[in-house]
Amino acid sequence: MMNDMRNDDPNFNVMGNFDHGLTLALSKGRILKETLPLLEAAGINLLEDPEKSRKLIFPTTHQKVRILILRASDVPTYVENGAADFGVAGKDVLMEHGAQHVYELLDLKIANCKLMTAGKVGMQHPKGRLKIATKYVNLTRQYYASLGEQVDVIKLYGSMELAPLVGLGDYIVDVVDTGNTLRANGLEPLEEIMKVSSRLIVNKASFKRKQALLDPILAQVEEAVNQR
């Protein structure tokens, strides 16, 4: 939710060093849209709409919080390395990234979907070594290894549905919500690899050093999640 209230703290500067405050990393799209009501419960409202701006750093109505807008896959990296104090990322992204150096504190129970395999409708399972197109290279390898299948994984960054249609891959691995995009391209979901929801993660050093700032926000967000 956008808010036209100004942040009049004279020490508030969204650019540059922000040691006196908290930096929150979010990604555009569904996660941002579904996270904003939870942040509102903690008194954090954006002063501008990221969907209508080219800016990447945004002030909020909370005097000690600014928000970074990133690619979803970059959120764990920013939090892990201390460029952001906390963030919201999908469980799929966290598992793929291998974010061992952050605390995963809360399942926000938003942006729910499934990581699944998918292929052309009615196709026979190919013999021999499979070709799998995906942006989830690590999770894909782990999944097929658990089945005892050898696969060649082809890294893509988008439009996964195209791969089986043009012979680039036998199957894809991607997140599935309604399945409408798959069906529109003659594909069908097959096997579920994992259920996915968005998680609140915190930099380990920030969790200790900025605990007095973080604790009230985390408690209010958790309460908002529990009341949904």
Swiss-Prot record:
Q: What is its EC number?
A: 2.4.2.17
The UniProt keyword set, sorted, is: Amino-acid biosynthesis, ATP-binding, Cytoplasm, Glycosyltransferase, Histidine biosynthesis, Nucleotide-binding, Transferase
Report the catalytic activity.
Answer: 1-(5-phospho-beta-D-ribosyl)-ATP + diphosphate = 5-phospho-alpha-D-ribose 1-diphosphate + ATP
**Annotated InterPro entries:** ATP_PRibTrfase_cat, ATP_PRibTrfase_CS, ATP_PRibTrfase_HisG, ATP_PRibTrfase_HisG_short
Any one GO BP annotation for this protein = L-histidine biosynthetic process
> How does it associate, per the subunit comment?
Heteromultimer composed of HisG and HisZ subunits.
Protein name per Swiss-Prot or TrEMBL = ATP phosphoribosyltransferase
* Organism annotation: Acinetobacter baylyi (strain ATCC 33305 / BD413 / ADP1)
